[in-house]
Amino acid sequence: MPADYTSTARALSLPTSPSESLSPADNDSYPPWSHLASGRSNPAHPSERPTLWKQVTHRLNETSQRMMAIWRRLSFWQKVGAAAAALLANLLGIGFLVFTGKVFIWLGPVAEQWEQSVVAYTVLWLCVFFVSFPPLVGWSTFGTISGYIFGVWKGWFLYASATVLGSTCSFVVSRTILSKFVNRMMERDKRFAALALTLKYDGLKLLCMIRLCPLPYSVCNGAVSTFPTVQPLMYGLATAIVTPKLLVPAFVGSRIRLLSEKGEEMSAGSKAVNIISIIVTVAIGIFTGWYIYKRTMARAKELEAQERADIRRSLQADHADRRPHHSFSEDPDVNTAATTLARDEEERLGFHDFDDDNVDLAIDDESGGENSPRLQSGGPYRDEFTDNDSDDVFKNGDGGEGETYGLHTHVRKS
């Protein structure tokens, strides 16, 4: 009866057990984009851009967690060595500050005499020049001393000229010494190769931004020299363009001398103006360096994304047409960097796994005789069986003792 059939079908369609919530393991079985879609469709959590304070605290928390994870992985003696190194660095920093203060106290009586001395000017210029080579330090201190002895403009010219020439020479020497290291990095490190490409196509602008960043001076000279796409003249030009920032230490040095020589004669207001000018100048320099650093990192990531997109399109086009990848640039340094990124992109796209259509079966006669199928055909052996071939492939046995064959797979280049 139809009525009984309908009621029976409805009864069978009911669940035999109450519905249960999915376990975490069941949730993990769903594809990841389903979670993303549900997250986007939830109106209870509107997307809001985090404030600067939240970004800073989040970054500090991430850094502290990363440092704690590294610390927990260290052995006992590694922890002892790390603690000793941190203590030594703090002691050296305090000692350097004390030494710098003693230098200005010692320079007080002789600053007026040395201001017109050519020998003092030359010696200080050479000091700035030589601290350009890593791992020497004291570049900022010499800039302040230049302003302390020779005033703002004369001290700035000394500081700027020695900085430009010193950084260029340091760049050339570091590149010569670190050439083997550069080659290894270009072939193995995809991040290094990406930054090398960004410096090639947006070189001068990005170099100027790097020179404005608050990075260790001599170490920066050696680090940038490892990028083969940066030329020495371009690096020297970028350093010369940003020399106006060197007015900051020269100005601070001149204000320190003014306060030390005429501090007793100044009124409280004049002292306050000079001290505030020093603080404001230093604060502007720090803020500018931090801002430029953030912009530099953002620009580097943007250029790297563009380079990767171009390489990805080239790889996809070559793979679709089944043709080999040609060189990316006539410049060998650029081509090496692009090839390193191309290998990384191939792994991401899955092109490193060759399909069966690109694999040929070749049987090479290891005896090297004239009857080798490879020698007769002039290329790899390919199976060309047809439906009409009904011979038993096992009827001839294993063959003679001298007929030994090697089985290899060859990947077609075309």
From Swiss-Prot:
It is a multi-pass membrane protein. Coiled coil: none annotated. Residues 1-90, 139-155, 254-271 are lumenal. The chain crosses the membrane at residues 91-111, 118-138, 156-178, 233-253, 272-292. Residues 112-117, 179-232, 293-414 are cytoplasmic. InterPro entries: Golgi_membrane_TVP38/TMEM64, VTT_dom. Residues 147-256 are annotated as: VTT domain. It holds the Pfam family VTT_dom. GO terms for cellular component: Golgi membrane. Glycans are attached at N27, N61. Disulfide bonds: none annotated. Residues 12-24 have a biased composition (Low complexity). Residues 1-10 have a biased composition (Polar residues). Keywords: Glycoprotein, Golgi apparatus, Membrane, Transmembrane, Transmembrane helix. GO terms for biological process: mitotic spindle elongation; vesicle-mediated transport. It is found in: Golgi apparatus membrane. Residues 1-28, 317-336, 360-414 are annotated as: Disordered. The VTT domain was previously called the SNARE-assoc domain. As there is no evidence that this domain associates with SNARE proteins, it was renamed as VMP1, TMEM41, and TVP38 (VTT) domain. Belongs to the TVP38/TMEM64 family. Golgi membrane protein involved in vesicular trafficking and spindle migration. PANTHER family: GOLGI APPARATUS MEMBRANE PROTEIN TVP38 (PTHR47549:SF1), GOLGI APPARATUS MEMBRANE PROTEIN TVP38-RELATED (PTHR47549). This is Golgi apparatus membrane protein tvp38. The lineage of its organism: Eukaryota, Fungi, Dikarya, Ascomycota, Pezizomycotina.
